[in-house]
């Protein structure tokens, strides 16, 4: 894994392939290693860049910053690698920063692919999310036992409507790494309590946007998807059968198909009809 210093932060990244640039932005609590189920297949078509955001995994020693720091980091990394404009794929919290990147630095983004972006998630909590918080004593554990609080969040976010969750099935190394940076996860979650980016910022985005939605995901993520697409008339939602919030891990082959279709490298699938008022 290579390194690049941007905005005073030493970021670790991995690069594969030689096609059009594709930047992968991981979610809150995740890290670049979780893209491994799709990296090789994506590299057949794209120049893929996957990095650990500041505060996570191998970039954990980077100075902490606010939420906007992640968009600035991504823009600077693309510039340093000569990879702009790129298709930017943001998963969960990474989708929030992908939106921010497209709003703040539109010239760096050719298109957005958002895998259940967790934008304004706290403005539409669901019974599942509230039950997770109550059952785990989430708010009490945040300070007393960060790893336990992060575990509860990971299990809820990766949960299937049919029962069980994807987090518990991940390789042990991945789970251990995600729990190791629990404090960074909880700090970022706390920062995301306020709606971010603003509605005006999201509305300013003009590039093509595809939102990927798992048909087994918690309704909170479905609501977030609808919120984002309600602000972006050019956006469309594509459903991924058999997947919950860890979409590219649950259904890696189909996930790659959706990404390649979204960027014009394959026939486009049928979009899910809009569920929000016009």
Residue ranges and their predicted role:
Residues 6-61:
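Conserved HGGG/HGGXW glycine-rich cap/lid loop of the alpha/beta-hydrolase fold
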Residues 103-104, 109-142:
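Flexible "cap/lid" loop of the alpha/beta hydrolase fold
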Residues 176-230, 236-239:
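Conserved serine/cysteine hydrolase catalytic core
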Residues 144-186, 201:
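Conserved alpha/beta-hydrolase catalytic His-Asp/Glu region
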Residues 97-101:
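Hydrolases whose catalytic domains are alpha/beta-hydrolase-1, hotdog thioesterase
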Residues 37-40, 49-89, 93, 257:
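Active-site loop/oxyanion-hole signature of alpha/beta-hydrolase fold enzymes
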Residues 34-36, 59-64, 124-125, 222-223:
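Conserved catalytic-core motifs of eukaryotic protein kinase domains, centered on the activation segment
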Residues 240-252, 256:
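Catalytic histidine-centered segment of alpha/beta-hydrolase-like enzymes
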